[in-house]
């Protein structure tokens, strides 16, 4: 692990995957009698949990009501907010088609799709902000702009991730947000501020995000612990 980290410069999560694969190969060789001992029998590698970056409710509201100067910034903000309120990754946003939008008899809209990264199916209901953005881009006049590809057959006119990243920096400054906005933060914001902090169980969040394993969603466990701590603090304040 030290070699992979300090010599090869791999990230903790990558090291964890590499070691898991190596342990599997060595264990099979040992079980097949090709090795006298399994050197990895009692070896475990625990990767450091990455720090999760997400927006608070206050920052989300600043983003919604803030004024931006350019049309492309307005579109990029819409795309970012849609991801905040659905948990979609940038890749899944770009490939979202109308066939993946389902409306129930009571008028609610749902996204039923498959994650591009993991090929895992996921379903998520459109909250009012996401629904309003969807309706905005169903109007043909809002779909066409020389800075955004037409993206035929898709729901949104999505620009490149690099171009959107540059826009997000300007948007943050104009909306009074000090954090360095990146599109992966939108997905984290959905998981934390909009889901876990509103009492949605971790297992349900995992399904909405399209995670292949529930363990992947454990990166948000620290936020869950923070929620518990805040709840206990409120009880202590009430009791006096």
Which stretches of residues belong to each language-model region?
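Short, Lys/Arg-enriched alpha-helical recognition elements, typified by the DNA-recognition helix
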Residues: 1-28
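Conserved tyrosine-mediated DNA breakage-rejoining catalytic core shared by Y-recombinases
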Residues: 44-53, 57-59, 95-136
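Catalytic-site neighborhood detector that most strongly recognizes the C-terminal catalytic loop/helix
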Residues: 47, 54, 115-119, 209-234
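C-terminal catalytic core of tyrosine-transesterase DNA break-rejoin enzymes
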Residues: 81, 85, 91-92, 170, ...
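Short, polar N-cap/turn motifs at the start of nucleic acid-interacting alpha helices
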Residues: 100-107, 178-179, 199-219, 230
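C-terminal catalytic core of Y-nucleophile DNA break-rejoin enzymes
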Residues: 116-136, 144-170
């Amino acid at each position: 692990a030290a070699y992979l980290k300090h010599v090869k410069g791999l990230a903790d999560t990558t090291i964890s995957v590499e070691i898991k694969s190596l342990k599997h190969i060595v264990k099979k060789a040992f079980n097949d009698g090709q090795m006298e001992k399994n050197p990895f029998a009692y070896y475990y590698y625990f990767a450091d949990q990455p720090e999760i970056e997400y927006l608070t409710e206050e920052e989300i509201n600043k983003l919604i009501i803030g004024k931006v100067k350019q049309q492309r910034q307005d579109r990029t903000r819409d795309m970012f907010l849609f991801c905040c309120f659905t948990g979609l990754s940038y890749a899944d946003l770009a490939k979202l088609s109308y066939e993946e939008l389902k409306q129930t008899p009571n008028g609610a809209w749902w996204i039923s799709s498959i994650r591009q990264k993991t090929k895992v199916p996921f379903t998520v209901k459109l909250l009012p902000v996401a629904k309003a953005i969807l309706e905005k881009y169903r109007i043909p006049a809002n779909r066409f702009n020389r800075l955004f590809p037409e993206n035929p057959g898709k729901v949104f006119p999505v620009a490149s991730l690099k171009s959107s990243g540059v826009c997000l920096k300007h948007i943050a400054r104009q909306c009074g947000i000090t954090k360095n906005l990146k599109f992966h933060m939108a997905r984290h914001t959905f998981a934390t501020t909009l889901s876990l902090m509103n009492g949605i169980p971790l297992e349900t969040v995992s399904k909405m995000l399209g995670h292949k394993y529930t363990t992947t969603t454990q990166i948000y466990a620290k936020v869950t612990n923070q929620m518990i701590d805040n709840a206990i603090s409120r009880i202590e304040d009430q009791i006096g």
